Amino acid sequence: QTAPVPKAISK
């Protein structure tokens, strides 16, 4: 499972 940049969701 590859998430679409979890960092962007965190911000």
From Swiss-Prot:
Tissue expr: Expressed by the venom gland.
Cell compartments where the protein resides: Secreted
Main location per the UniProt record: secreted
Residues with PTM Lysine amide: 11
In-chain residues carrying the UniProt-annotated modification Pyrrolidone carboxylic acid: 1
Alphabetical UniProt keywords: Amidation, Pyrrolidone carboxylic acid, Secreted
Gene Ontology, cellular component aspect: extracellular region
Further details from the record: Is a minor component of B.maculifrons venom.
Name the record gives this protein: Peptide Bm-10
Organism: Batozonellus maculifrons (Solitary wasp)
Species lineage: Eukaryota, Metazoa, Ecdysozoa, Arthropoda, Hexapoda
